[in-house]
């Protein structure tokens, strides 16, 4: 253990003790309710990886376990690759593929909005990754621009990340809780009944497509973007419009209209999206067949960490580090909710977490 690698930063209660024998710190790349994310370099081969550190103890909860188990099973070019988990004296470290291109969200913020062709280029990759997840019986449940990363290539490859809210129909029951970020949540999820997570993912993909094309969220009131109650009402009523200044093809409008359908039974499905004329236009050959993509993604690296080893590490990670105590307060991740949440605080049905994600009590 490299004691010189003891560090503390935002989003952490106690300093991280790195596994200095295997990875060396390059820099911090993010922080939030989960803890902190760091860019690290493998001492064995010099490869850059992203490492998500979560403090040992109570924070190693069901969401963390679900994220690791589901993420471990997924091997696809449009999904951030899970590598391994490591237990340090202070934290659980989740080692993942590093996407050097940053968030798709940042790219849109810089561009304002995308052309229809550019939006389609990224949407095709998003649907390819989501389709693969669903084929593995995993629904993501928190698809959003902030959870889609890009690699560093000239024509960036999109990478889905953050499986903390994902559910597997093999390992878990039908989704019932309301999770996700307000702007992306499907109507049936807000109704607090059992729902098909795969169809709910379709809605979230539609929100992502709309934001790429328009540069704004479809169901937010532009005058009151932080008014979540109004956003929720507009979602339930499917109240959206495409501004006059946004020029998109009739085929694109048709696809959006078939995604934004309140009744999940009549909403377009992922397989139907993949056969839609707008989606098929200029579709890269490597996105046409999931089986070919998966076979192309066989990696000659170290064998996958066994489930038994992972479960043992997770069990040990629930034991708090010796001498753990508050050094830093958590900093809010994502949306800044301080100003406009007073009216929601009094609602007994709502639990609005500081990350900007809404979880309805069941």
UniProtKB/Swiss-Prot annotation:
Its main location: cytoplasm. ATP binds at residues 29-37, 52. Its EC number is 2.7.11.1. One of its GO terms (molecular function) is protein serine kinase activity. It is found in: Cytoplasm, Cytosol; Nucleus. The active site is at residue 142. Expressed in leaf blades, leaf sheaths and roots. Expressed in shoots and roots of young seedlings. It catalyses: L-seryl-[protein] + ATP = O-phospho-L-seryl-[protein] + ADP + H(+); L-threonyl-[protein] + ATP = O-phospho-L-threonyl-[protein] + ADP + H(+). The keyword Iron-sulfur does not apply. GO terms for cellular component: cytosol; nucleus. Activated by hyperosmotic stress and abscisic acid (ABA). GO terms for biological process: abscisic acid-activated signaling pathway. Keywords: Abscisic acid signaling pathway, ATP-binding, Cytoplasm, Kinase, Nucleotide-binding, Nucleus, Phosphoprotein, Serine/threonine-protein kinase, Transferase. Residues 23-279 form the Protein kinase domain. Pfam families: Pkinase (PF00069). PANTHER family: SERINE/THREONINE KINASE, SERINE_THREONINE-PROTEIN KINASE SRK2E. May play a role in signal transduction of hyperosmotic response. Together with PYL10, PP2C53 and SAPK8, may form an abscisic acid (ABA) signaling module involved in stress response. Together with PYL3 and PP2C50, may form an ABA signaling module involved in stress response. Belongs to the protein kinase superfamily. Ser/Thr protein kinase family. Interacts with PP2C53. Interacts with PP2C50. This is Serine/threonine-protein kinase SAPK10. It comes from Oryza sativa subsp. japonica. The gene is SAPK10.
């Amino acid at each position: 253990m490299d004691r010189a690698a003891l560090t503390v930063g935002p989003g952490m209660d106690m300093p991280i003790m790195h596994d200095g024998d295997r990875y060396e710190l390059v820099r911090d790349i993010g922080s939030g309710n989960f803890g902190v994310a760091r860019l690290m370099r493998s001492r064995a081969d010099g490869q850059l990886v992203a490492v998500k550190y979560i403090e040992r103890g109570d924070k190693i909860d069901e969401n963390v376990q679900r994220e690791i188990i589901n993420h471990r099973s997924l091997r696809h070019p449009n999904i951030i690759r899970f590598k391994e988990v490591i237990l340090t004296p202070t934290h659980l470290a989740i080692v993942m593929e590093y996407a050097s291109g940053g968030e798709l969200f940042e790219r849109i913020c810089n561009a304002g909005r995308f052309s229809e062709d550019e939006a389609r280029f990224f949407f095709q990759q998003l649907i390819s990754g989501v389709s693969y997840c669903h084929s593995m019986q995993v629904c993501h449940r928190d698809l959003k621009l902030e959870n889609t990363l890009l690699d560093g290539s000239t024509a960036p490859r999109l990478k889905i990340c953050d499986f903390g809210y994902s559910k597997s129909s093999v390992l878990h029951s039908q989704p019932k809780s309301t999770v996700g970020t307000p702007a992306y949540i499907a109507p049936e999820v807000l109704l607090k009944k059992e729902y098909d997570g795969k169809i709910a993912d379709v809605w979230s993909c539609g929100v992502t497509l709309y934001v790429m094309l328009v540069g704004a969220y479809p169901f937010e009131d532009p005058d009151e973007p932080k008014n979540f109650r109004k956003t929720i009402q507009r979602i339930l009523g499917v109240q959206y419009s495409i501004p006059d200044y946004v020029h998109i093809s009739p085929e694109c409008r048709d696809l959006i209209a078939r995604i934004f359908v309140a009744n999940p039974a009549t909403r377009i499905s992922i397989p139907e999206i993949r056969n839609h004329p707008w989606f098929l236009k200029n579709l890269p050959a490597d996105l046409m067949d999931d089986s070919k993509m998966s076979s192309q993604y066989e990696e000659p690296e170290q064998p996958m960490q066994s489930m038994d080893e992972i479960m043992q590490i997770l069990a040990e990670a629930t034991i708090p580090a010796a001498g753990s105590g508050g050094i830093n307060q958590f900093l809010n991740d994502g949306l800044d909710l301080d100003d406009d949440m007073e009216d929601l605080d009094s609602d007994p049905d709502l639990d609005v977490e500081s990350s900007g994600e809404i979880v309805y009590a069941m």
